[in-house]
Design a protein with these regions (language model features):
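Extracellular N-terminal segment of 7TM GPCRs
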Residues: 1-61
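Loop architecture of class A 7-transmembrane GPCRs
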Residues: 26-37, 108-131, 178-226
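Extracellular TM2-ECL1-early TM3 structural module of rhodopsin-like
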Residues: 40-52, 79-142, 149
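Helix-to-loop junction signature of class
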Residues: 51, 55, 93-111, 132, ...
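Helix-loop boundary elements of multi-pass alpha-helical membrane proteins
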Residues: 63-83, 144-167, 261-276, 338-346, ...
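Intracellular effector-coupling site of seven-transmembrane GPCRs
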Residues: 83-84, 89-90, 201, 240-290
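Fourth transmembrane helix
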Residues: 93, 97, 104-107, 131-141, ...
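Seventh transmembrane helix
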Residues: 227-231, 274, 282-286, 291-292, ...
């Protein structure tokens, strides 16, 4: 495809339509619009509400997680707590850098047009991509920690410690920051406020360079393709180990069918596998569309444009990807009784305080 078309697609701003204009246009021209445009306009309308609501909910949930988890009342080890707090902290950063400082200004350009005056878009991109990488690889690190705890009993006491968790998390953070420095040279400092994967203007040299396209392609291979493969592999091995161990334990206890309800070890294993699969499965499901679309986009710029993916697929991918940053902790709270109770207590506290003040 002609490179000029690529420039036009990736370096122009959106027309800054408001929610009302999008809605009225879709209603007035619904019958005459092709399906692809119907879907794209529909998702743009949804995003006007979706992103602000998600920002508020995600910000609150992750702040609560950072406050509650370190108190040690959720029934998990200090090592696991380290990982969960780190995941909540990086998810909070993604919410700030991606939702609040990127997606919301894109959809509310009239109210937030002053964002264009800040020429720090490439620095913003470095911070956002580094935070995103940390969020993804912290999930991988947590999955590997649970794999070691369940499948490698001899190494469990050495690896599954608070100190090791701190070293792993620190190393991942440093590598993620170093890995994403190249965005400073690919992107410019000017914001486009366009609803595209890149929210900064891109120079012609980058658009026409297969070298830069290959570097960006490699970036998406490292995150999230490799994490996908690692999480699937580790979960498969871990699940097999838990199932075999549980079966052997049932036989030793003389239970031919079903779990013994009075067996605390079986309950602990069941909780472990639920937590592991829900958090990592949530990551896989919510990142799948974004990963496929990102890989296709880079193949398109490398010249492989035989397969067409509609633009609304990109919208779906972005919406699900940012949703993943708000769900890990919420899912954890739903699957762990003690943690769920802590969140309930915090949620009830303001109302309890108000009632006490009223009674006075």
């Amino acid at each position: 495809m002609d490179q000029n078309l690529k420039k036009m697609d990736w370096n122009v701003t959106t027309n800054g339509k408001s929610f009302i204009l999008y809605f009225n246009y879709l209603v007035a021209h619904y019958e005459e619009l092709p399906f692809v445009l119907r879907m794209r306009y529909a998702f743009r309308i949804i995003q006007y509400i979706y992103y602000p609501v998600l920002a508020v909910v995600g910000f609150a949930v992750n702040i609560l997680s950072i406050v509650i988890l370190p108190r040690g009342k959720c029934g998990v080890s200090r090592c696991v707590t380290r990982y969960l707090v780190a995941m909540a902290a990086t998810d909070l950063l993604v919410i700030i850098l991606d939702l609040i400082l990127r997606h919301i200004p894109i959809h509310y350009q009239k109210e937030l047009h002053f964002v264009r005056s800040f020429r720090v878009c490439n620095i913003h991109a470095i911070l956002l991509q580094a935070a995103t990488d940390c969020s993804v690889w912290f999930t991988v690190s947590f999955t590997f920690d649970r794999f070691m705890a369940i499948c490698c009993q001899k190494l469990k006491t050495k690896y599954c410690t608070e100190r090791t968790a701190a070293v792993v998390l620190g190393t991942v953070t440093l590598l993620s920051g170093f890995k994403n420095i190249f965005w400073y040279f690919i992107l410019t400092g000017f914001y486009t406020l366009a609803n595209m994967p890149w929210f900064c203007y891109i120079t012609d040299d980058v658009l026409n360079s297969p070298v830069w396209a290959a570097i960006i392609f490699l970036h998406y291979i490292l995150t999230p393709c490799i994490p996908f493969a690692l999480i699937l592999l580790l979960n498969t091995v871990t699940a097999r180990r838990i199932i075999l161990a549980s079966r052997a334990r049932r036989q030793l206890r003389g239970a031919s069918s079903g779990d013994c309800p009075s067996d605390p070890e079986m309950a602990s294993r069941r909780n472990s596998i639920i937590l592991l699969f829900v958090i990592s499965g949530n990551f896989i499901l919510l990142w799948a569309v974004f990963m496929v679309n990102s890989i296709w986009t880079q193949m398109y710029f490398l010249g492989y444009d035989s397969v067409y993916i509609p633009f609304y697929v990109m919208d779906i991918g972005l919406m699900l990807q940012v949703l993943s940053c708000c769900t890990n902790t919420a899912i954890y709270a739903m699957t762990q009784t003690k943690c769920r109770q802590q969140f309930k207590n915090v949620g009830k506290y303001p109302f309890t305080l108000i009632l006490k003040l009223i009674k006075r």
